[in-house]
């Protein structure tokens, strides 16, 4: 009972609880925040005012500069110098005369900006289009300072067809190269005469090349029993049947082919044949070593001298012929060369000039 009376007396002392919907009073905090924002606004206004004043000054400065400097002419400094020199009667001008010409004809050079003078001197002294002339000892040169400048003869083409316009950076004058011997794209002059030469191998007719392939195929498919002048005659007739460009000029001696283009009758190349006017087919001067290439026998090397004959290998089957026709002489054909000593002997006794055979021995 004593505990309950103590609790009741404490509740009576506290009194009933009251719920108030009003917000607590935070007036002191609000005052501090208002003062803080007011200070920030004052600083911002001061800074913006200063920025606006600076921008006004900058705009006024730019306006002054834009009013002082005129628009630059649509020409490069090289073109301006060339114009000043070309307007002179003697096509020669000093640096002072170039300055005066530019100031008289262009408003840009009459302003307060003086940096263009350095650009004129720089382009005048470093460009290959302008030549500095030495001083002469005469009355006209007495008391005058500076050298005269003129335009180089190799750069006069720049003055034609809008040559005064600005060119890309790093431009240099191109020197013209003349070739007196060549009169056209497909002509060559030799000794005062002009000869045409084929621009490409496609100018040969298809009929001539097809007839050559057919004749060679028929000869090789016969088994290679008859090797003599008949084969060479057929091959030469087949090659000459193709339409090839003429090597004989009008009223000129026969021209023989050589390694470097056209030969002459007085100085023909050693391997050029006086009988035929077109190169013949020959085996390249290459020797093989059997130790370095196992399975392949050494191939003979044929050095053409005066004989225009072409000796095909003895091939008996059509399949081996097609393989050799596509990929060159095979190992079997090379072996046929080695085993055909009697064939070479027969050719020698027939009255033809023997072709030297050089075998590379290891």
From Swiss-Prot:
Annotated Gene Ontology cellular component terms: nucleus
Pfam family, one: Forkhead
GO biological process: anatomical structure morphogenesis; cell differentiation; mesodermal cell fate specification; nematode larval development; positive regulation of mesodermal cell fate specification; regulation of transcription by RNA polymerase II
Entry superkingdom: Eukaryota
Disruption of the gene: reported phenotype: Embryonic lethality; those few animals that survive to adulthood lack functional embryonic and M lineage (mesoblast-cell) derived coelomocytes (CCs). RNAi-mediated knockdown abolishes expression of ceh-34 in the M lineage.
DNA-binding residues (ranges): 72-169
Primary role: Transcription factor that is required for cell fate of coelomocytes which are non-muscle mesodermal cells. Acts in concert with, and by activating expression of, the homeodomain gene ceh-34. Binds to the sequence motif 5'-ATAAA[T/C]A-3'.
Protein name in UniProt: Forkhead box protein F
Organism: Caenorhabditis elegans
Species lineage: Eukaryota, Metazoa, Ecdysozoa, Nematoda, Chromadorea
Gene: let-381
């Amino acid at each position: 009972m004593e505990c309950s009376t103590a609790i009741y007396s404490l509740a009576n002392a506290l009194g009933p609880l009251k719920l108030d919907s009003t917000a607590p009073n935070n007036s002191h905090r609000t005052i501090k925040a208002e003062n803080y924002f007011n200070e920030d606004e004052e600083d911002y206004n001061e800074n913006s005012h200063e920025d606006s004043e600076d921008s006004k000054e900058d705009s006024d400065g730019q306006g002054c500069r834009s009013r002082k400097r005129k628009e630059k002419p649509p020409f490069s400094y090289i073109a301006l110098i060339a114009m000043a020199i070309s307007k002179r009667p003697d096509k020669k001008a000093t640096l002072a005369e170039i300055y005066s010409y530019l100031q008289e004809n262009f408003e840009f050079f009459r302003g307060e900006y003086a940096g263009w003078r350095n650009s004129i001197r720089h382009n005048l002294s470093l460009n290959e289009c302008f030549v500095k002339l030495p001083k002469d000892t005469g009355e006209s040169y007495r008391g005058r300072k500076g050298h005269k400048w003129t335009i180089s003869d190799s750069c006069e083409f720049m003055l034609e067809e809008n040559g005064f316009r600005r060119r890309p950076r790093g431009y240099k004058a191109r020197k013209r190269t003349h070739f007196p011997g060549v009169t056209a794209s497909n002509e060559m002059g030799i000794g005062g005469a002009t000869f045409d030469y084929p621009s490409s191998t496609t100018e040969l007719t298809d009929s001539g090349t097809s007839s050559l392939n057919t004749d060679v195929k028929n000869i090789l498919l016969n088994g290679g029993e008859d090797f003599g002048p008949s084969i060479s005659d057929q091959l030469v007739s087949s090659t000459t049947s193709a339409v090839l460009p003429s090597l004989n000029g009008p009223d000129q001696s026969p021209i023989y082919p050589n390694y470097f283009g056209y030969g002459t009758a007085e100085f023909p190349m050693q391997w050029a044949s006086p009988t035929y006017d077109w190169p013949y087919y020959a085996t390249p001067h290459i020797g093989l070593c059997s130790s370095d290439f196992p399975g392949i026998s050494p191939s003979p090397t044929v050095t053409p001298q005066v004989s225009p004959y072409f000796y095909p290998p003895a091939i008996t089957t059509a399949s081996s012929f097609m393989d050799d026709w596509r990929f060159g002489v095979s190992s079997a054909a090379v072996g046929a060369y080695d085993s055909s000593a009697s064939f070479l002997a027969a050719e020698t006794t027939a009255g033809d000039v023997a072709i030297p055979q050089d075998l590379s021995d290891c």
